[in-house]
Amino acid sequence: MARAFPLERVRNIGIAAHIDAGKTTTTERILFYSGVVHKIGEVHDGAAVTDWMAQERERGITITAAAISTSWNDHRINIIDTPGHVDFTIEVERSMRVLDGVIAVFCAVGGVQPQSETVWRQADRYSVPRMVFVNKMDRTGADFLKVHGQIKDRLKANAAPIQLPIGAEGDLSGIIDLVENKAHIYKDDLGQNIEVTDVPDDMKDQVAEWRTYLMEAVAETDEALIEKFLETGELSVEELKAGIRKGVLKHGLVPVLCGSAFKNKGVQLVLDAVVDYLPAPIDVPPIQGVLPNGEEAVRPSDDKAPFSALAFKVMADPYGKLTFVRMYSGVLAKGSYVLNSTKDSKERISRLVVLKADDREEVDELRAGDLGAVLGLKATTTGDTLCSAEDPIVLETLFVPEPVISVAVEPKTKGDMEKLSKALVALAEEDPTFRVNTDQETGQTVIAGMGELHLEILVDRMLREFKVEANIGAPQVSYRETIRASSRGEGKFSRQTGGKGQYGHVVIEMEPGEPESGFEFINKIVGGVVPKEYIKPSEMGMKETCESGVIAGYPLIDVKVTMIDGSYHDVDSSEMAFKIAGSMAFKDAVKKCNPVLLEPMMKVEVEVPEDFLGSIIGDLSSRRGQVEGQAIDDGTSKVSAKVPLAEMFGYATELRSMTQGRGIFSMEFSHYEDVPRNVAEAIISKNQGNS
């Protein structure tokens, strides 16, 4: 089957922003103008195409990244609409991992918000080229150039407007295209009758100034253009377009557009810019991976290359389990068998679909650069690599943040116990930041996630999708443990009980690992002092001990263990003996490595009227917070601080009463930090049942 669109005419893009910037409305308009939907759906009416879960339509926020295919100007555009709420950071993270370009949507009134910075950092982590759409230009207080300034200052981006608004707030009547030097005047409410004319006389000076600014920014990304610009002071439309594209692909330039998705102004120009400036799969560096022999390798975006794809999302669906994949190379055909190289298991591709939100189109194959979904995969979970069994490779996986909050959950009726465990398994398969475990002492089921809203929505889904009513306990902080020193540890397990005995002996070196590295195991056994078949069980024993902690029962993170020595017995050694010896060696080493308790620190931003600034700062300090910055803008004070999550429960209610309901705040996970000794002692004694 031939390609419907050549690779250079494919765009895999994400639409990302902070909550309420109008991201889903922008996606809706893109689908309307490109012909996927024939009626405009509004988020506030609960009718948006990409918000297809019941909770999304009720709450007016996007929770899961819905993938939709559309086309514009002979280009295939695959769009992922991502959530703006910080509790759903993993959804943004996983979509960034598989995208080639991003439209960052900002509100013309609110500008750069804390969540915008998080999304920007995620795009930086995966080096995703991007452009900005400053939305809601029709709102009172809209200020395009102010937002452009914030993008430069707060996000440190080389942002250059390629448009200017004609009017603002209620008088927004059109948009100036600085590249073409033309005005687009909107003649009807649906934004379909557009008159392209010369720049209005009263804007000629402003347009000339910003056009020069754009030319300078573009020239800086290309030496040939710098020379021409310095000589003539001018760049042609073709040179500008080529220069902007080159700058975007090299991460040296961020074009800034404006409009109002809700009022149907500027969306077609956004689509034009996606086609003109954002990369095709062949414009971005080939995906990297690791071969079975440990060597690094790349897979080019090419149908003729060996097949490789990344599973970036798993969803329970009325028709079975849907696994969303990003195709990086080769062709994936319906009915074929492929290798899940992450888990070393074979998978059969029973059906392939391309999605249009909750509508789907069955296809016979997916090709390099495509986004689609597979039905019928058994073992594949988020972050796994699918590839050809003849050319195995494991692609770079997703970064998954540690959960920060946990609650105990139990079914309202004993009969629902089995349904509850099924629901929890299905939800954990979909969402890697959602963890389920059983408290060894109490036997309670504990669920952990990225925030209260995250867990609330998952509990809500249990009721709606799995018909399980559950009782939820009070939220608990997900503490972690780590080490601050290095040491050696030894574990010898020897048992003679008549007949065959048990023998395992392991020697390790333990040291602090890199931040966010979790548990890292290195095998340096030489000369066969411990046979190969006992290395994995030794590692498993250490890993299990790592997960149950040593100080207060919380998982140990960022620990590097090197197995350096040991011994075995021809008859008495077994996998179980080495698993126990590995665990003993781990416990022996860790107590000599200065273990400490860690707590999640949250990045908190509070906005209050100026009069309340003093009491807000005092209150944050009393919560063990470190105030990192404050700014006053039009009588509103903004305070940013790092505060332990343990001190932030109930803050929304406190803030309301302190500010007479006029304060707002946002909170997201920042990092883990050592718990002060006096606080740690209380937590440890409580966990050991001494309090």
Swiss-Prot record:
The keyword Nucleotide-binding applies. Residues 8-282 form the tr-type G domain. Disulfide bonds: none annotated. One of its GO terms (molecular function) is translation elongation factor activity. It comes from the Bacteria. Keywords: Cytoplasm, Elongation factor, GTP-binding, Nucleotide-binding, Protein biosynthesis. GO terms for biological process: ribosome disassembly. InterPro entries: EFG_II, EFG_III, EFG_III/V, EFG_IV, EFG_V, EFG_V-like, EFTu-like_2, G_TR_CS. It is found in: Cytoplasm. GO terms for cellular component: cytoplasm. Belongs to the TRAFAC class translation factor GTPase superfamily. Classic translation factor GTPase family. EF-G/EF-2 subfamily. Catalyzes the GTP-dependent ribosomal translocation step during translation elongation. During this step, the ribosome changes from the pre-translocational (PRE) to the post-translocational (POST) state as the newly formed A-site-bound peptidyl-tRNA and P-site-bound deacylated tRNA move to the P and E sites, respectively. Catalyzes the coordinated movement of the two tRNA molecules, the mRNA and conformational changes in the ribosome. This is Elongation factor G. The lineage of its organism: Bacteria, Bacillati, Cyanobacteriota, Cyanophyceae, Synechococcales. The gene is fusA.
